[in-house]
Amino acid sequence: MIFSTLEHILTHISFSIISIVITIHLLNLLVHDTVGLCDSSEKGMMATFFCITGLLVTRWIYSRHFPLSDLYESLMFLSWSFSIIHMVPYFRNHKNSLSAITAPSAIFTQGFATSGLLTEMHQSAILVPALQSQWLMMHVSMMLLGYASLLCGSLLSVALLVITFRKTLGIPGKNNHFLIGSFPFGEIRYFNEKRKRSVLKKTSFFSFRNYHRYQLTQRLDHCSYRIISLGFTFSTIGILSGAVWANEAWGSYWNWDPKETWAFITWTIFAIYLHTRTNQRFQDVGPAIVASMGFLIIWICYFGVNLLGIGLHSYGSFALTSN
């Protein structure tokens, strides 16, 4: 009873803090960039991280298994993963260029997890025999860390496409400034002077706005590539460990289960992204389109099976819980 109450308190505290963080971030964009607001936002995300960590540890203690057995627990772990991705850039250079992506993603996943749709999953249950394995922590945690990284990288690619096509189509409006201000990357440090001269040739000498926009798109492309590469690595480890676990549990490494099929499709999409990103003929827009497609595929892979409750991976799904 004590652990359940503590988990309930930590859930509401973390959700309240991250809501305040998003409000601060919006005020920072609408009013002006102030150090005080930025610091408050970062401290809020750290507090959210510790609250969700405490929540997961508490659930782990009283359930006696790693909290990744149903949709509710996986959503909370996904929100925890977003908070980690949020803090990494800040600790590296004290500038968070991902706050416009990670904070809304964290509140969306946690909000859905704590909604009335998943109320019955809030109470921990005994693991089914197939999930009583040491591979549970390895496989599911790697997949969810991969999903979080791939989603963040894909959203950066979506932002790149929005900025690029608004410029190409010549769409006016203040939203350009709002979108550009959402990603405080600052000045790009070019690896060599040749790269810098290439950037200057592609923008007008007298157009600082175009130069800054081009800098932003290049930085978005670079950050998207790095985060997606990390997520692709996590997903690969997760799929391989899942195959070993499947062989132990079901006697086969691969069964073309709906979850496995969509995981393979997701992996293939981002493998194509990495290939096009390293190809000189496809730059910026081409890989960004592929990554944007991957954003939708990830949600189909993650929510599709869990919401429909079909296949071998339907443990703790929404459909089974509702029934």
From Swiss-Prot:
Signal peptide: none annotated. It is a multi-pass membrane protein. PANTHER family: CYTOCHROME B_B6 PROTEIN-RELATED, HEME EXPORTER PROTEIN C. One of its GO terms (molecular function) is heme binding. The chain crosses the membrane at residues 9-29, 45-62, 71-91, 98-118, 143-163, 227-247, 261-275, 285-305. The lineage of its organism: Eukaryota, Viridiplantae, Streptophyta, Embryophyta, Tracheophyta. Required during biogenesis of c-type cytochromes (cytochrome c6 and cytochrome f) at the step of heme attachment. It is found in: Plastid, Chloroplast thylakoid membrane. May interact with Ccs1. Pfam families: Cytochrom_C_asm. Keywords: Chloroplast, Cytochrome c-type biogenesis, Membrane, Plastid, Thylakoid, Transmembrane, Transmembrane helix. InterPro entries: Cyt_c_assembly, Cyt_c_biogenesis_CcsA, Cyt_c_biogenesis_CcsA/CcmC. Belongs to the CcmF/CycK/Ccl1/NrfE/CcsA family. It comes from the Eukaryota. NCBIfam families: cytochr_II_ccsB (TIGR03144). The keyword Disulfide bond does not apply. It comes from Calycanthus floridus var. glaucus (Eastern sweetshrub). This is Cytochrome c biogenesis protein CcsA. One of its GO terms (cellular component) is plasma membrane. One of its GO terms (biological process) is cytochrome complex assembly. The gene is ccsA.
